[in-house]
Amino acid sequence: MNIAMTERYKWLLFFLFILLTYFIPLETRLLWQPDEIRYAEISREMLVSGNWSVPYLLDIRYFEKPVLGYWINCIAQWLFGESHFAVRIVVVTSTLLTGWLIYKAAMVVWRNSALAFNAMTVFLSSFLVLAIGTYNILDPIVTLFVTAAMYSFLVALSTPNKKGKIIAYMGIGFFCALGFLTKGFIAVVLPALVFLVMAISQARFKEVVCYSSIALLALAITAGPWVITVALQAPDYWNYFFWVEHVQRFIAKESARSQPTWFYIPIVILGVLPWLGFLFGALKSAFSLKKGTLYFLLWFTLFFAFFSASKGKLLTYMLPCFVPLSILIAHYIEELKDRPDEKISKVNASINIAFGLMGISAVIYSLYSAKFALYDTNETLKIVLAISGFLFWSVIGAGALFRQTQFLTMFCSIGLSLVIGYAIPEKIESRSTPENIIQRYYEPLSNKSYLLTDEVGIGTSLAWGLKRTDIRLTETKGELAYGLNYPDVKNKYYSLEQLLALIEANQYKGVAIVLVRPDRKQILTKLTTLKEKPIVEKEGDLTLVFFN
């Protein structure tokens, strides 16, 4: 592929890449629990109940996030029905719009369409972005709003006239408010931190402080109505959301999400594939503070440092960091065009070849390892598809190596994107994507008066699959523990003793329990030694117990 042809067809090939990686796989992959189905079910319940102010999950108050993400998902479900496409189209659209803002931001600074195109391409083809940006969680949505706020500040700095600055600062406040309504204070605090440091470094502190009142006013007007409404309808919402979901998560050492400070370093290294060969050179170049890189460097380093300092860590928190990182990598790739040495490009291509081969080796090794076994012997098609996805990655890497073009690099992930929905091992599928199992047992599950489970994620999956919210919990309360403290939902949780009493009182009829790996607990033994024996069905990590 020569340079002229690449320029001529790059947009056509780019849209083909988007179609193959972001849209075609949407309906083919089952929804993952707990995250994807949780947000789908909250939106479904909101749409059915008409309560647009206070989020509920399984008819239990759920205060972990604000409402905007649920509202947007409600609209998608209203337009497209309760499908995988409807559930995921919001995050996909958010990710693609973030890519477009990356293009716009690069154009504001460098007025270089090739650099801007590369920045957008690097972002949308990065491994972590592809994984999170097509997965129904709130991070892609809040990343869009944070990116829009950061872009607005960039425009405010570069606009000479007062009217343009006022509009830009109104945009900052508006988009920070949308981010706040999606995921909370983080969408305001982190951009403000970057704005402050950038203003000081550019000797424009007075100007930024002066115009910030406009942003604060726009933020208050946008977010204020819901902030007041939820405080009136659920007076303890803000106490829980601020102290538990923000302060405790940031400082709690014993949190379930607690990870070491270096946790995100390997995530960035792996997540930036297939552009890893350019990562360290891009950061080194950015730290030299060449024209235009300071803002994006501050954006990346301050966000990264903040999330690394937090005790509670999740892989998805890194998504906003990949916006400025993609721009820095694209800037470095543009710098390399002026150098005759193609060593960095060859290193990057070689890394992609090696990654594909390592993936193939890992799949093959798992077939002969009892400890790391992924697939059963009857999953031949899944094994072939997994190997094919990694093989495609290596082949594209080899093409980039021998043809000496970076344009091919973005296509590395297409193979995995297309096959991943069909290549998930059954042992993972049974617990993490239980939709098929629920549909297989739809009739015996749906006709039960009492339906219980020992894991919230499975309960949410049952609610989504059966379109009923009267799912009850037993043994564990999980993320619904706070909501279960309300007196009007005391019948939503049963201890083991209460469950046994319920079954007996119901004359051993009309009760179904879905258990996750019950061999580690006493519950299955207790259930199977009752006076009347239940029907027990084993499906991977799930065990279904029926009292008919």
Swiss-Prot record:
UniProt KW keywords: Cell inner membrane, Cell membrane, Glycosyltransferase, Lipid A biosynthesis, Lipid biosynthesis, Lipid metabolism, Lipopolysaccharide biosynthesis, Membrane, Transferase, Transmembrane, Transmembrane helix
Spans traversing the lipid bilayer: 11-31, 89-109, 114-134, 137-157, 180-200, 214-234, 263-283, 292-312, 314-334, 347-367, 382-402, 405-425
Catalytic activity: 4-amino-4-deoxy-alpha-L-arabinopyranosyl di-trans,octa-cis-undecaprenyl phosphate + lipid IVA = lipid IIA + di-trans,octa-cis-undecaprenyl phosphate
GO molecular function list: 4-amino-4-deoxy-L-arabinose transferase activity; mannosyltransferase activity
Source organism phylogeny: Bacteria, Pseudomonadati, Pseudomonadota, Gammaproteobacteria, Enterobacterales
Stored InterPro entries: ArnT_tfrase (IPR022839), Glyco_trans_39/83 (IPR003342), LipidA_mod_glycosyltrf_83 (IPR050297)
Keyword Zinc-finger part of the UniProt annotation: no
Metabolic or biological pathway, per its Swiss-Prot or TrEMBL entry: Lipopolysaccharide metabolism; 4-amino-4-deoxy-beta-L-arabinose-lipid A biosynthesis
Annotated protein name in UniProt: Undecaprenyl phosphate-alpha-4-amino-4-deoxy-L-arabinose arabinosyl transferase 1
Membrane topology (UniProt): Multi-pass membrane protein
HAMAP family assigned to the protein according to its UniProt record, in alphabetical order: ArnT_transfer
Family that this chain belongs to: Belongs to the glycosyltransferase 83 family.
Primary localization: membrane
Compartments in which it is found: Cell inner membrane
One GO location term (cellular component): plasma membrane
Entry EC number(s): 2.4.2.43
Coiled-coil zones: none
Species: Proteus mirabilis (strain HI4320)
Annotated Pfam families: PMT (PF02366)
